[in-house]
């Protein structure tokens, strides 16, 4: 996978026109263009590829999509070492041709393919793993698309650049990679991991089974994997959820009760949630279910 610079004729003409600008304005304009297109082609070291796939726990059942695939190394490695399937997209026809030829050479053409395509127009819905190595501006441009199109539980891994402060990674790892110094002057790499959370924002009706036997109306607000909300039940004033968290389809939150709190853990499945709750005051456990209230 690699950061990309668009090489189509229209872009070449645009960059040629930039030549008439003063040096400072030219540098700023080129930087904006690289942020928009993802950046120049920079090969990803094999050691970084291996770490990205390790953090994503890629296996034989996975479908990997690589945005800005460059020489194809991530999808090729996923197919060869981990028996996964997938495809990469890039706007450089020559790199796409090179990647497809390499897939054929390695006997991987039935599991690894590469396409000339704009990352913004790529259908991400098949991915169980998404990989990226794009400049910060492009990462921010793609953030909402990634969140909206990928299924809950999909793993997203990025080399060096994140989705910004609003969507913090679920995990990250930084280590020394001396061979990178020759490329960008920095002998280190950082790999970020996100697990796409279920979409739970809205109103829910929660039923708590015996021995607690009660009903709550939940109102949830979500910003990526961050969750907050309120619960009302039994004629009492709404109380705020605490200890709330989304990790893929897993949801955790707590509700104040009798000077303590009920701790809920469960799974989200579309319009329903269910799981177990540790009751306040050590009074045992109970099952709970919740159904989305349609407006």
Residue positions per predicted region:
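Active-site capping/gating segments
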Residues: 162-203
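Central antiparallel beta-sheet cores of small beta-barrel/beta-sandwich binding domains
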Residues: 198-295
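Class I SAM-dependent transferase core
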Residues: 28-59
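S-adenosyl-L-methionine
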Residues: 100-122
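N-terminal secretory signal peptides and thylakoid transit peptides that target proteins
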Residues: 2-22
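Conserved SAM-binding motif I beta-strand of class I
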Residues: 85-90
């Amino acid at each position: 996978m690699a950061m990309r610079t668009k090489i189509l004729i229209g872009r070449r003409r645009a960059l040629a026109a930039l030549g008439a600008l003063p040096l400072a304005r030219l540098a700023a304009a080129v930087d904006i263009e690289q942020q928009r297109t993802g950046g120049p082609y920079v090969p990803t070291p094999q050691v970084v590829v291996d770490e990205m796939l390790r953090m994503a726990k890629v296996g034989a059942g996975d479908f990997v999509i690589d945005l800005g695939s460059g020489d194809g190394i991530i999808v090729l490695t996923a197919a060869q070492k981990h028996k996964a399937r997938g495809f990469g997209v890039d706007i450089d026809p020559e790199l796409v041709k090179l990647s497809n030829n390499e897939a054929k050479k390695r006997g991987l053409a039935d599991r690894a393919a590469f396409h000339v395509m704009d990352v913004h127009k790529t259908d991400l819905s098949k991915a169980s793993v998404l990989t990226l190595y794009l400049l910060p501006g492009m990462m921010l441009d793609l953030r909402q698309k990634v969140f909206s199109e990928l299924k809950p539980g999909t793993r997203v891994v990025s080399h060096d650049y994140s989705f910004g402060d609003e969507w913090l990674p679920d995990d990250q790892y930084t280590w020394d990679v001396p061979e990178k110094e020759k490329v960008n002057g920095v002998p280190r790499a950082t790999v970020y991991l996100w697990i796409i959370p279920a979409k739970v924002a809205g109103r829910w009706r929660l039923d708590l089974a015996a021995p607690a036997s009660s009903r709550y109306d939940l109102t949830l607000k979500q910003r990526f994997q961050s969750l907050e909300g309120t619960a009302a039940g039994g004629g009492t004033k709404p109380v705020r959820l605490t200890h709330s968290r989304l990790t893929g389809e897993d949801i955790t939150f707590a509700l104040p009760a009798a000077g303590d709190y009920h701790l809920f853990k469960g799974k989200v499945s579309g319009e329903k949630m269910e799981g177990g709750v540790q009751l306040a005051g050590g009074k045992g456990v109970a099952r709970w279910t919740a159904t989305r209230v349609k407006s």
